[in-house]
Amino acid sequence: KKGIEKLDKAIQKLLLKQDPELIIIETSGSCHPMPLIEYFKNHSQVELTGLFTLVDSLMLAHDYQYGESLIPKMRNNLVNGKRDTVNLLVEQIMFCSHLILTKGDRIEQDRLPHIASYINEINPHVSVHSVLFGKLEIESLFELEEYDYFKVAQLAKELKPVIERE
């Protein structure tokens, strides 16, 4: 809640002085995307064009068998009423419009499509890109369509009470 209040103050201050074409906001890796999505959905002066999630492909390889164990671990958490980093990671994947696999140079290249396939089981609408040595084409950020709130509306409705309790 305080983070959204700080963000709102910063954006209002920025809009008083400038009319930016694009604002890029980097959040903490432990930040749940839903409050940010709701903030922009209800904002009259700025729109959310993309929600990027960066996922460490080396971590997925080692901790989640290249993504294969993400859904089973999430199911287990749901059955047991447990919330941990698995929930956060899966929910970040579910809400994002673009996913960037970092450290793609640190795993076997033929494993990247496997990781992408498991990510697409969680979010079939997300475009998955791998970056090697941290190189991202910045121009791609300027070619985004508006974020599709409809795709995540039901998910947001179901998760809102859970997230508010955290």
Predicted regions and their residues:
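Nucleotide-state-sensitive switch-loop elements of NTP-binding domains
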Residues: 1-87
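Short glycine-centered, acidic/aromatic-flanked micro-motifs in structured strand/loop junctions
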Residues: 27, 102-103
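Short, well-ordered beta-strand core segments
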Residues: 51, 99-100
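C-terminal accessory "lid"/substrate-recognition subdomains
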Residues: 74-98, 104-166
